[in-house]
A protein has these predicted regions:
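N-terminal presequence-like segments and the immediate start of the first folded domain
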Residues: 1-174
Length: 174
């Protein structure tokens, strides 16, 4: 792979407005991929003529901190959706995938040893508004509290995905 792609999440909304936010830096980041998932930029053409160009996570370091941006992470292993129709099982796979990304970041990129409890922000995208309460309660059972967790109703990149999580961790460097 010749490029380092950004961490990214793309979801649909009910409104007519396009909303984009991004963080830019002059320094390149370090891309992180989940060893249990096909990298999105290598997806087979059955998903899209042009594969999405993003890293599963990106590490950015400066003199005072290390930031891990985790792209929207869903219930996908290899390139296949798992647990169609079961939002709580999909949530568990999302969390497991984020744990793998954190472990890979630590092992392959000498990133600070962190765990899910160290995440400073989670955005949880839920397809069906009726699932908000069960997703919130199950997530709390799985990982406990995260300082900032936002639950957002959104259309996800595949019809059979019901939940997706984007995460952020910031660690001071010594």
């Amino acid at each position: 792979r010749d490029h380092i792609y950004p961490a990214a999440t793309v979801v649909g909304t009910q409104g007519k407005e396009l909303k984009i936010y991004f963080i830019a830096s002059k320094a390149p980041g370090l891309g992180v991929e989940n060893p249990q998932q096909v990298s999105a930029f290598l997806y087979p053409p059955e998903y899209s003529k042009d594969p999405p160009l993003f890293s599963r996570a990106l590490i950015h370091r400066n003199d005072t901190q290390e930031i891990i941006f985790v792209s929207g992470t869903a219930s996908i292993l290899g390139h296949s959706t798992l647990h169609e129709g079961d939002v709580l099982k999909q949530l568990e796979v999302c969390v497991d995938n984020i744990r793998r990304l954190i472990k890979t970041a630590a092992n392959e990129n000498q990133c600070s040893a962190i765990n899910l409890a160290d995440m400073t922000q989670l955005k949880v995208y839920v397809k069906n508004p009726g699932d908000f309460t069960s997703v919130r309660n199950h997530l709390k059972r799985i990982i406990g509290g995260i300082s900032t967790t936002c639950f957002i109703q959104a259309d996800l990149c595949r019809d059979n995905l019901l939940v997706e999580i984007e995460a952020l961790a910031i660690q001071a460097t010594s």
